C-alpha cells in the first residue's frame, strides 16, 4: 500500500485494510487496460495484476464525497447487471435512499422519455463498466456523471471516477458497496463519528445463491420432519406402555388371560356337550333319508 496523501482523519483503519485483503479486492485479472496502470501495484509471476488498495480506499472516499454532495438521494441511480452486485445495489439503495436498477438495464431508460421506466438521474454508479455498458453509453448522451467499480481490464470510456477493485468476486463487490454506503452515511452525519461502528455487517451486501438457499431450507425442513416423526413414535409407544401398565396386574399378559379363561372352561364345555348330544338327531334323520333314496336303476 502506497503512502496516503489524505488527511489523517481519512486514513483507513487496520480493520478496513484487513477486510479489503480478505475479500480479495486487490486481485485483478491477467489483462491490463492502459488507463488502469496508475492503480497497479505489481504483477505476480502467474500473470495476475495486483491492485493498490491504497488507491482503492482513496477512490472510495472521493466517490462518497460526490454522492453526499447530491441533495436528493433519489437522483442517484445505482446499477448492476452482474448477479454478484444486484443484492449489493439493492442494499445500498435501501440504506442511502438511492434508486436501484438490479438486473437487465432497459435501453432507453435515460434517453427515451416515452418509456415507463424513464429516469433523469444526476449521478449513476455501476458495478462493472463492461456489463453495464448500455447505461454508461446512455449517460454519456445526456451528460450524467458516472462512477464505476473498475478491474484492471475494465474499459474506462465515459467513466468519470473509477474505483479500482476486483469487480468479479461476490465478496469484493459486496464489501466495496458496503464501504461506500458507510462513508456516505458518515459524511451525511447519520453516523456521528468515524469511530462509530456501523451496525450493518458486510455480509448483508454479499450475493447469495437462491438455489443453495432453497436446498438448505429443504434440508432443514427434512431434518425437522424426521425429528418430529421420531418424537411422535416415542410418544405413541409411551402412551401404549402407560395403557398396558394402568389396566391392572396381569393386563397385557397373554398367560394370565388364558389361565382365567381355562378356569371357567369345564363348565362351559359341559354345557356345550349337552347341546352336541341334542344335535345328534339330525344325523339319524340323515340316515333315514339315505334309506329312502331310489335305486340307481329306478332313476
From Swiss-Prot:
Q: Name one GO cellular component term.
A: cytosolic small ribosomal subunit
Q: Where in the cell is it found?
A: Cytoplasm
* Record bears the keyword Cytoplasm: yes
Q: What is its main location?
A: cytoplasm
Provide one Gene Ontology biological process annotation: ribosomal small subunit assembly
Q: Name one Pfam family in it.
A: Ribosomal_S2
Q: Does the keyword Iron apply?
A: no
Low complexity compositional bias, start-end = 259-291
From which domain of life does this come? Eukaryota
The UniProt keywords, alphabetically, are: Cytoplasm, Ribonucleoprotein, Ribosomal protein
Q: Where is this region: Disordered?
A: 259-299
For this protein, what is any one GO molecular function term?
Answer: structural constituent of ribosome
Q: Which family does it belong to?
A: Belongs to the universal ribosomal protein uS2 family.
Q: How does it assemble?
A: Component of the small ribosomal subunit. Mature ribosomes consist of a small (40S) and a large (60S) subunit. The 40S subunit contains about 33 different proteins and 1 molecule of RNA (18S). The 60S subunit contains about 49 different proteins and 3 molecules of RNA (25S, 5.8S and 5S). Interacts with rps21.
Its biological purpose:
Required for the assembly and/or stability of the 40S ribosomal subunit. Required for the processing of the 20S rRNA-precursor to mature 18S rRNA in a late step of the maturation of 40S ribosomal subunits.
Q: Which HAMAP family match?
A: Ribosomal_S2_euk (MF_03015)
What NCBIfam families does the annotation carry?
A: uS2_euk_arch
| Name of this protein | Small ribosomal subunit protein uS2
Q: Which gene encodes it?
A: rps0
Amino acid at each position: 500500500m502506497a503512502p496516503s496523501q489524505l488527511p489523517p482523519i481519512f486514513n483507513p483503519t487496520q480493520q478496513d485494510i484487513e477486510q479489503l485483503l480478505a475479500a480479495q479486492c486487490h486481485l485483478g485479472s491477467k489483462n491490463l487496460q492502459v488507463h488502469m496502470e496508475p492503480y497497479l501495484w505489481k504483477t505476480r509471476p502467474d500473470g495476475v495484476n495486483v491492485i493498490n488498495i491504497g488507491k482503492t480506499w482513496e477512490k472510495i472516499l472521493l466517490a462518497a464525497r460526490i454522492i453526499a454532495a447530491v441533495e436528493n438521494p433519489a437522483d442517484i441511480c445505482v446499477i448492476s447487471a452482474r448477479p454478484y452486485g444486484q443484492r449489493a445495489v439493492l442494499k445500498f439503495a435501501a440504506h442511502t435512499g438511492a434508486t436501484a436498477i438490479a438486473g437487465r438495464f432497459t435501453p432507453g431508460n435515460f434517453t427515451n422519455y416515452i418509456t415507463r421506466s424513464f429516469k433523469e438521474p444526476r449521478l449513476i454508479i455501476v458495478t462493472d463498466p463492461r456489463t453495464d455498458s448500455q447505461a454508461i453509453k446512455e449517460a454519456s448522451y445526456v451528460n450524467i456523471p458516472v462512477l464505476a467499480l473498475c478491474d484492471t481490464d475494465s474499459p474506462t470510456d465515459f467513466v468519470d471516477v473509477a474505483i479500482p477493485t476486483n469487480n468479479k468476486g461476490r465478496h469484493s463487490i459486496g464489501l466495496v458497496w458496503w464501504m461506500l454506503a458507510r462513508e456516505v452515511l458518515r459524511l451525511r452525519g447519520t453516523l456521528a463519528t468515524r469511530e462509530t461502528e456501523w451496525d450493518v455487517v458486510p455480509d448483508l451486501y454479499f450475493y447469495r445463491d437462491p438455489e443453495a438457499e432453497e436446498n438448505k431450507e429443504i434440508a432443514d425442513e427434512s431434518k425437522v420432519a424426521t425429528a418430529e416423526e421420531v418424537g411422535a413414535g416415542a410418544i405413541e409407544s409411551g402412551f401404549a406402555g402407560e395403557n398396558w401398565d394402568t389396566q391392572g396386574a396381569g393386563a397385557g399378559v397373554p398367560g394370565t388371560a388364558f389361565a382365567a379363561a381355562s378356569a371357567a372352561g369345564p363348565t362351559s364345555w359341559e354345557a356345550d356337550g349337552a347341546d352336541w348330544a341334542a344335535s345328534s338327531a339330525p344325523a339319524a334323520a340323515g340316515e333315514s333319508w339315505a334309506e329312502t333314496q331310489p335305486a340307481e336303476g329306478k332313476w
